[in-house]
Amino acid sequence: VGIQFKLIIVGQEFDTEMPIFTESRNFFKDEIIHMGYCKSFEDYASWLWKADILPVTINQEFFGASVMEAVYCNCYPLLPKRLTYPELFNDRVNALHFYHNTNDYDNKLKSLLINQNLGHNLNEITQKYDWSTMSIQYDQLMNIT
């Protein structure tokens, strides 16, 4: 198809690299601009702020903190319609951010890569999890205020 893109893969590294990461590193060698662990939160956040699209394919997730961090940095999430995501991101209001199966995922990701005008803003979702909001709730729960 000839769609041009760059790839950022951040995450923990282990002593032995999983075969899928070795294969990805080789297959996408010209597209990868960063792959691996970030030594500081600032480094991690800087990569998130550089990203446009966050394709999520994870099979197990309890809250989705890393997804929420990326969305806070204005990444457009493409999420499976399962796990915690429909509740966190209101799948009825934000239906375009969700895919139902592999074919739907492929089509939506291709469309996002071609149509760079993403036109999204999910700040109202991330704001309620921002520390400035959460700290007040924690203080109230612990009767600190």
Region annotations inferred by a language model:
Residues 54-55:
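A short hydrophobic beta-strand element within the catalytic core of glycosyltransferases
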Residues 100, 113-145:
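A charged, aromatic-enriched C-terminal amphipathic alpha-helix characteristic of glycosyltransferases
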Residues 11, 19-42:
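Nucleotide-activated donor-binding/catalytic signature segment of Leloir-type glycosyltransferases, i.e.
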Residues 45-51:
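Short alpha-helical donor nucleotide-sugar binding micro-motif in glycosyltransferases
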Residues 76-79:
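Short hydrophobic beta-strand element within catalytic cores of glycosyltransferases
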Residues 91-103, 111-116:
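Conserved acidic donor-binding segment of nucleotide-sugar-dependent glycosyltransferases
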Residues 45, 63, 68-72, 86-87:
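Short alpha-helical segment that forms part of, or immediately flanks, the ligand-binding pocket
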Residues 59:
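Aromatic "clamp/platform" in nucleotide-sugar-dependent glycosyltransferases that forms part
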